[in-house]
Amino acid sequence: MEETSVAGDPGPDAGTSTAPNAAPEPVARRQRILFVGEAATLAHVVRPFVLARSLDPSRYEVHFACDPRFNKLLGPLPFPHHPIHTVPSEEVLLKIAQGRLFYNTRTLRKYIAADRKILNEIAPDVVVGDNRLSLSVSARLAGIPYIAIANAYWSPQARRRFPLPDVPWTRFFGVRPVSILYRLYRPLIFALYCLPLNWLRRKHGLSSLGWDLCRIFTDGDYTLYADVPELVPTYNLPANHRYLGPVLWSPDVKPPTWWHSLPTDRPIIYATLGSSGGKNLLQVVLNALGRFTRDGDRGHRWPEPPEERAGQRLRRGLPAGRSGCSALRRGALQRRQPDDAAGVGGRGAGDRAPQQHGPALEHGGP
């Protein structure tokens, strides 16, 4: 029997028919996120780079801004890159070693102008910055939510102390007198380092962050710590401060030509100072490792000098892929700053880990 429809009855095929002029469903706009890395050291570039690369491009429109000095290590970028200026790494590290202001008012003023230009051009929904202190001003002036990436060592709620730095004063006056003066004057030294950013914040109508240097390095609408609480414990963290965990990265490079010539019958120690490690520390590290590089039975060192194998970066997992290989690394700049900056820090010892933790220690803070 032929089916018919009556008034008020849509009929069996009505639900599957489409009106020719029906408007298509609106496609959800991708969130636009700008990642900004401060290229004073490699760590502050690769951490936002790794996070940016981890986002689903079908859901997020990602932009990446940094000084291009480390781009050759990053490889092809899967998103637009926007070059911004960062003061030379050597200049920043020298100022830190000398206890001088690493970012003065003039530098931060230039940074803020560059930030505002790129924020206006991209108009992101969120900006994520790693050690780009000027975003504390520029993002707020643009009305854009700001997520700061930092090390938990810098958290105002971190359970840690600031050790005496290895500075020339200790050679002239002795460790004990300088230690006493350091404990007395450290809060004042830290306060001096807060002056440039606080002055610029007030100039732009923003409130001061106070005189705790830890607040300067962790200010953000949200703050993500690239650490785990077991490494740097904290107490009473604000709701907008979270542990992100280690951000792992390594350059995609081939192993050096000598890698497969290393002995397989003895443990291997892979030492890396990171991009912020002082070159003068390399021999200190090698001397300290001397007892590990001796053959216990024959009492001699490995024949090939360690210096001939220095200066090359290894792909993540390569050292750990060798049986009995351990990693020894120097902390990244953010771990050093409370120690070295303002004459407020020391020569940090490396972290030694068993084989399975090698990649994390090697690349958690390049």
From Swiss-Prot:
Annotated SUPFAM superfamilies = UDP-Glycosyltransferase/glycogen phosphorylase
Could you identify this protein by its name?
Inactive PGL/p-HBAD biosynthesis glycosyltransferase BCG_2979c
Return the similarity comment: Belongs to the UDP-glycosyltransferase family.
Region described as Disordered:
1-23, 295-366
Q: Where is the composition biased (Basic and acidic residues)?
A: 295-311
